[in-house]
């Protein structure tokens, strides 16, 4: 059963582009927290799903209890119940460079994308994204001029009877496109694990952040789990290369897995000692990631 809601939108304007990135939550599973709790509880209870639903309806199970139970289950890695909760998004103003990455997510997500075969750009004017780095380098004017010429040639081709499916070969990766997607919560978690990471391409990070923002508005109990994989509600540590971890702006507060292994090995060998009171005089608090006890 789907819960239809008034469309709500999160957007991210980009300097110099024709369209802003917009992400709108169109609908979602009816009461995602309840649905997810029932899915998990069915696996770990003698009660039938109908009996669990009645207990929730009778207020014998609170939302706080449901949230706590789900959190405990998530820590075990039991993921299949997450597939029973789905979100439906409208995404617009994104580039084809983004879309080629987006559609690589294939499990638990379905896409419908604006076609360049059936949609013809009027007067050769196609919306496109200008990266901030291009604008800061003072090269946006040259990019605009080039795309103006592309648009003119595109229009001439269509006017000459060349099908849009062939004229589109001219169009650049910067060309904007639109999506309507349906994604289950397990897949959305995986997307955010990877695409909220600072190593992900900036446009994908923006889209993932806007999707998270939309989910937080309707189910904050679940939205808080939409983090990069190093987040406190996910792995809690970085498993990328140590070089990438060292360059990450949040690397100071998120340990790398190899660092954890080295700390454990030192502890196992008895090479560590608890933090002493006098140690605070020589170690700045901001540099402390893991403390002895």
Each language-model region and where it sits:
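Family-specific signature for flavin-dependent thymidylate synthase
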Residues: 2-293
């Amino acid at each position: 059963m789907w819960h239809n809601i008034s469309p709500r939108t999160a957007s991210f304007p980009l300097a110099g582009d024709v369209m802003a990135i917009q992400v709108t939550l169109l609908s979602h599973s009816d009461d995602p927290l309840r649905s997810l709790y029932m899915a998990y509880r069915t696996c770990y209870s003698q009660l039938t799903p109908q009996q669990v639903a009645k207990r929730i309806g009778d207020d014998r199970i609170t939302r706080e209890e449901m949230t706590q139970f789900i959190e405990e289950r998530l820590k075990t890695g039991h993921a299949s119940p997450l597939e029973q909760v789905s979100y439906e998004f409208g995404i617009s103003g994104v580039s084809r460079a983004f879309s080629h990455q987006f559609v690589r997510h294939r499990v638990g997500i379905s896409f419908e994308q604006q076609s360049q075969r059936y949609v013809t750009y009027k007067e050769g004017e196609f919306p496109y994204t200008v990266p901030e780095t291009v604008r800061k380098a003072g090269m946006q004017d040259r990019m605009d001029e080039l795309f103006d010429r592309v648009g003119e040639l595109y229009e001439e081709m269509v006017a000459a009877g060349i099908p849009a499916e062939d004229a589109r070969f001219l169009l650049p990766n910067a060309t904007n496109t639109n999506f309507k997607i349906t994604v289950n919560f397990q897949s959305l978690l995986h997307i955010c694990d990877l695409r909220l990471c600072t190593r992900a391409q900036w446009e994908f990070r923006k889209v993932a952040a806007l999707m998270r923002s939309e989910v937080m508005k309707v189910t904050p109990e679940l939205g808080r789990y939409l983090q990069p994989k190093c987040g406190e509600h996910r792995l809690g540590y970085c498993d990328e290369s140590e070089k990438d971890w060292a360059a990450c702006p949040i690397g100071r507060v998120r340990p790398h897995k190899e660092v954890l292994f080295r700390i454990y090995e030192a502890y196992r060998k008895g090479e560590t000692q608890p933090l002493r009171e006098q140690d605070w005089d020589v170690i700045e608090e901001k540099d402390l990631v893991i403390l002895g006890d």
